[in-house]
Curated annotation (Swiss-Prot):
GO CC field: cytoplasm; endopeptidase Clp complex
Name this protein carries in UniProt: ATP-dependent Clp protease proteolytic subunit
Enzyme class: hydrolase
Keyword Transmembrane: no
Subunit structure: Fourteen ClpP subunits assemble into 2 heptameric rings which stack back to back to give a disk-like structure with a central cavity, resembling the structure of eukaryotic proteasomes.
Family according to the record: Belongs to the peptidase S14 family.
Organism, as annotated: Methylorubrum extorquens (strain PA1) (Methylobacterium extorquens)
Pfam family, one: CLP_protease
Residues the record marks as active site: S107, H132
Function text: Cleaves peptides in various proteins in a process that requires ATP hydrolysis. Has a chymotrypsin-like activity. Plays a major role in the degradation of misfolded proteins.
Keyword annotations: Cytoplasm, Hydrolase, Protease, Serine protease
Length: 208
């Protein structure tokens, strides 16, 4: 049986109808925007959604390896390994990736926001950005719990190193900033180095 929540959300995705010499074609709005090299991360970061974003990044690179990709982020975060799969692909492909926070970029969402092309990481004025250390839970034998605790510590260190790379901050500064949930306005995120600028209006196209 189809998940009623999925059905509800999918039924609200608008369709765009285009006319051409070959007739009429209909696209869902996200597929139409993908043609303009625009990708969305909306909602929690998880394996299935991350795989779709990775596939879109690879497809757009194959289409044109030098043309910019715009990555819009509105996410509360989610699974660390899923987020890292997107992050690694962003760094792997040859296309520059512009990131833009609309709404919120929390946890892994903030890391992906910061991972955009230097000078091309943006947020809208009322966006909220939150950074913190990874969390997790595990039940089982004491030895297994210790193994998982060590894995979380290793992930924490790696995430700190990634934030250091993209913000230019010292490791200790990042370590302290991520000890607890750390919410920022767009202005604070810019000062911290997570973004490069705040966009109030879309820039006018350059005159021909």
């Amino acid at each position: 049986m189809r998940d009623p929540v999925d059905y509800f959300h999918n039924s609200l995705v608008p369709m765009v109808v285009e006319q051409s010499s070959r007739g009429e074609r209909a696209f869902d709005i996200y597929s139409r925007l993908l043609r303009e090299r625009i990708i969305f991360l909306t909602g929690p970061v998880e394996d299935q959604g991350a795989s779709l974003i990775v596939a879109q990044l690879l497809f757009l690179e194959a289409e044109n390896p030098k043309k910019e990709i715009s990555f819009y982020i509105n996410s509360p975060g989610g699974v660390v390994t899923s987020g890292l799969s997107i992050y690694d692909t962003m760094q792997f492909i040859r296309c520059p990736v512009t990131t833009l926070c609309v709404g919120q970029a929390a946890s892994m969402g903030s890391l992906l926001l910061a991972a955009g092309e230097a000078g091309h990481r943006f947020a809208l004025p009322n966006a909220r950005i939150m950074v913190h250390q990874p969390s997790g839970g595990f039940q089982g034998q004491a030895t297994d719990i210790l193994i998982h605790a060590r894995e979380i510590e290793a992930l924490k260190k790696r995430l700190n190193e990634i934030y250091v790379k993209h913000t230019g901050r010292e490791y200790e500064t990042i370590h302290q900033a991520l000890e607890r949930d750390n919410f920022m306005t767009a202005d604070a995120a810019k000062e911290f180095g997570l973004i490069d600028d705040i966009l109030h209006k879309r820039p006018e196209p350059a005159a021909a």
